[in-house]
Amino acid sequence: GKSSRSNPATYLKAFDEVRRLFSEQQGARQMGFTPGYFSFNAEGGRCEECKGEGTITIEMQFMADIVIPCEACHGQRFKSDVLEITYNGKNINDVLNMTVNQAVEFFEHQPVILRKLKVLQDVGLGYIKLGQPSSTLSGGENQRVKLATELAKRDTGRTLFILDEPT
């Protein structure tokens, strides 16, 4: 996906598991936060000032639009009460700012999340951030995210990948 809301973690569906994990933390349970509360795509826990984008776009009539960090959430996409919930000392924004390599280490005891992240690492994308908008990835990086998504699926023994590298 090329939308500003799509990123490697959401594309691989690893973010669904991360949101579930955060919703299971004691503070989240006490506040009644569901996995949806940890989504920047839905109302609830996202910053409503920027609608979870982390930025505000100022349209300029005769010049290029100006994009600035949201003053309400300081570019963190979520409300402060959501950012107070942590897993192993990190909040949801910290996780989105981790590289794949950092996240593989951080989630070493979460096999479902780890399996999806390891595939990104295996296709050479350990350096990208989990929350990096897909629109900022190169064409080759986006292709590798798509490949990783397919490789992360359960092996049926009936899949053939044909990779063509035109010159």
Name each model-derived stretch.
Residues 1-167:
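Conserved phosphate-binding elements of NTP-dependent enzyme cores
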